[in-house]
Structure formats: structure tokens, C-alpha cells
């Protein structure tokens, strides 16, 4: 099945402020939908602020919304999300808000109304039931309890 043949997931949204922008992709096939600021905010070095997007969405059941940083803002200006990734559960109906932080040590950054400040991706979220066991079976990769750099850096 080609990307153009895949069914489109419909995500209801509500505009809460006139300056709010509908989440959109820069290029067809992109996974992330840009979230834009619905207000202007100045972030001093080291400062964080919660930025309003002016929209609310209804993430479909069986899915989750993940809010991720925009790489260009991070690389060029040191702007990132405080809680990356942010999680939007299917039951949440409030305004999408993006907690940004200015990691730059010397430059103030101005978030302007309409500026793309984060990306939203929608992912399937499995229904799970956790089952207590005495012993966990080894995975196919035999990793065991190795974590935090156990695969090396090279």
C-alpha cells in the first residue's frame, strides 16, 4: 500500500483563538504536524514558559499524540520542550499548550504569534494488561539488564 492509498486518520479540532493555526505538515509524507504559537512570548536565557496554541484536538481512541521539539529551533536557538515528548491522551479536550525552554546562555528568544514551535505526531497506543511473573524470558537480542550505554558509543 503506497502512502497515498493509506486511510487518513480524521482528528477533530476546535479553534479556541482567532490567531490559532491548524496543525499542518511542511511536506507531504512528513510524520510531524507543526503546532504554532497563538501568542507572543519572550524567553530570556534559561527561562521557560508555557505557550498557547489556541487549538484543542480529539485524539482518536487507540492513539496518542506526542509533542516533539522542532529541530531547527533547537539547533539554531537552543529552544526545546521542557517535557519532550509531551503526551496527549485520547480523553484530553483542553487547549494544546507547549512548555518551551531557552537553553541558550546568552540570547533572548522571541516566540511570535504564528511561529511553528513544536511538532505533533499521532501514534497507535496498545491496550495492555500487565501480568506478574517470576522470571522474564530473555529477548531475542540477549540484552538482559544492560541499559544506559550498554551497547557502547562507537
Predicted features, each with a name:
Residues 1-154:
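DUTPase catalytic domain/fold
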Amino acid at each position: 500500500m503506497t502512502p497515498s492509498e493509506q486511510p487518513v486518520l480524521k482528528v477533530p479540532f476546535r479553534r479556541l483563538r482567532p490567531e490559532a493555526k491548524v496543525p499542518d505538515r511542511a511536506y507531504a509524507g512528513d510524520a510531524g504536524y507543526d503546532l504554532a504559537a497563538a501568542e507572543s512570548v519572550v524567553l530570556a536565557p534559561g527561562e521557560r514558559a508555557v505557550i498557547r496554541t489556541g487549538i484543542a484536538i480529539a485524539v482518536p481512541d487507540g492513539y496518542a499524540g506526542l509533542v516533539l521539539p522542532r529541530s531547527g529551533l533547537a539547533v539554531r536557538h537552543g529552544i526545546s520542550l521542557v517535557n519532550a515528548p509531551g503526551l496527549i491522551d485520547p480523553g484530553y479536550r483542553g487547549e494544546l499548550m507547549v512548555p518551551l525552554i531557552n537553553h541558550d546562555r546568552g540570547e533572548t528568544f522571541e516566540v511570535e504569534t504564528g511561529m511553528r514551535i513544536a511538532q505533533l505526531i499521532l501514534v497507535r497506543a496498545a491496550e495492555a494488561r500487565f501480568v506478574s511473573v517470576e522470571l522474564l524470558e530473555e529477548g531475542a537480542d540477549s540484552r538482559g539488564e544492560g541499559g544506559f550505554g550498554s551497547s557502547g558509543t562507537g
